[in-house]
From Swiss-Prot:
Main location: membrane
Topology term for the membrane: Single-pass membrane protein
Descriptive protein name: Accessory secretory protein Asp4
Subcellular location: Cell membrane
Keywords: Cell membrane, Membrane, Protein transport, Translocation, Transmembrane, Transmembrane helix, Transport
Transmembrane segments: 37-57
Assembly information from the UniProt record: Part of the accessory SecA2/SecY2 protein translocation apparatus required to export cell wall protein GspB.
A cellular component term, taken from the record's GO annotations: plasma membrane
GO annotation terms (biological process): protein transport
Disulfide-linked positions: none
Domain of life: Bacteria
Length: 60
């Protein structure tokens, strides 16, 4: 193969880690953490909105 695979060394390194033992957990990036917080906050806002809507509909 004339062209080297760019990810070959990365894949081989990961395979060696898996052979030698338990792989290390990778830390979640800042973007992943912000995304998780945003999704949870959005879900809570939707739930609170639904609860208030139901309370308002039941009062009438």
């Amino acid at each position: 193969m004339a062209k080297k695979d760019l990810f070959h060394k990365d894949i081989e390194g990961r395979l060696d880690e898996l052979k030698h033992g338990k792989p290390k957990k990778e830390k979640a990036s800042l973007g992943e953490n912000l995304n998780k917080i945003f999704v949870i906050a959005l879900g809570l806002m939707i739930l609170i909105g639904l609860i208030f809507t139901l309370i308002g509909a039941l009062r009438k």
